[in-house]
């Protein structure tokens, strides 16, 4: 049985989207996981905490004994059945725990007892995590081109359409502004970084450069890896500059049409509408100090009126009453100021289609 993976084999495992049965507790998995991992824990959070306390107070042997007491009988049978099903679904996968230690070996042993020979990752999640950090630091050294432009210019769509594009906002489950959250919760920082690293690794054999959206230090709660930020700070910039009306049409579809649909699909009609309303209010509230108290109150009233009108008519263009001044008075001046400090890095400016063609030719 192959149970020891070299660093190169770990990279191959990640690049090939090899399934990983992660047997850590959910709390550990939620703090950092790999893209192709499923969480089927040996111990749940409470059991893990109890064993950890026992280990501190009474040592390793007592902790192991407690673990076996907690996971036996029907509980053990249920978990073994779940691992068996996963092994049958993913015959080429690997078992993973925190460091490739006792938990992986116990699961491997219990599977062997029912006739399933399944390998584990020596070094566990820690080895995988170290590999993704090293991969990121190495791969970001390739040339980077950033796509910039005011909000609504389709930058994210353009990045996603390019084979060498790296979709930072997609991995972050966030679009970067105060209105950037999506229905999906953001990943833990380590998980975000792992997804980014694995995507770059998978594309690295076919592309010698990266195209990314011009982002700040963080996208919502997810910070960009320092090695990537350093490279982005000196990267060339291509700017998308579409007419205002076209930008508004994109924002209508993305922030109102799609978000209404996504919230209602996720939460149901009544709660979904309330979540959608709260989402827009929170976005405006987050920038109230920069708008000034009076202007923030005026735009909030326009937002309330627009929501009431949308609920009756299902027409989302009613939000232009507050979105248009918000762009003209706040977002556009802010981005143009930021862009003025990067003039020496701009190598091309054009409409969405012109920038699309520029990338096809360069």
UniProtKB/Swiss-Prot annotation:
Keywords from the UniProt entry: Selenium, Transferase
Lineage, top ranks: Bacteria, Pseudomonadati, Pseudomonadota, Gammaproteobacteria, Enterobacterales
NCBIfam families reported in the protein's UniProt record: PRK11784.1-1, PRK11784.1-2, PRK11784.1-3, tRNA_sel_U_synt
Oligomeric form and interacting partners: Monomer.
Catalytic residues (UniProt): 97
Protein name (Swiss-Prot/TrEMBL): tRNA 2-selenouridine synthase
Domain (Rhodanese) ranges: 14-137
Top-level taxon of origin: Bacteria
PROSITE patterns listed in its UniProt record: RHODANESE_3
GO MF terms held by the record: transferase activity, transferring alkyl or aryl (other than methyl) groups; tRNA 2-selenouridine synthase activity
Family classification: Belongs to the SelU family.
Reactions mediated catalytically: 5-methylaminomethyl-2-thiouridine(34) in tRNA + selenophosphate + (2E)-geranyl diphosphate + H2O + H(+) = 5-methylaminomethyl-2-selenouridine(34) in tRNA + (2E)-thiogeraniol + phosphate + diphosphate; 5-methylaminomethyl-2-thiouridine(34) in tRNA + (2E)-geranyl diphosphate = 5-methylaminomethyl-S-(2E)-geranyl-thiouridine(34) in tRNA + diphosphate; 5-methylaminomethyl-S-(2E)-geranyl-thiouridine(34) in tRNA + selenophosphate + H(+) = 5-methylaminomethyl-2-(Se-phospho)selenouridine(34) in tRNA + (2E)-thiogeraniol; 5-methylaminomethyl-2-(Se-phospho)selenouridine(34) in tRNA + H2O = 5-methylaminomethyl-2-selenouridine(34) in tRNA + phosphate
Organism: Proteus mirabilis (strain HI4320)
Its job: Involved in the post-transcriptional modification of the uridine at the wobble position (U34) of tRNA(Lys), tRNA(Glu) and tRNA(Gln). Catalyzes the conversion of 2-thiouridine (S2U-RNA) to 2-selenouridine (Se2U-RNA). Acts in a two-step process involving geranylation of 2-thiouridine (S2U) to S-geranyl-2-thiouridine (geS2U) and subsequent selenation of the latter derivative to 2-selenouridine (Se2U) in the tRNA chain.
CDD domains, A to Z: RHOD_YbbB (cd01520)
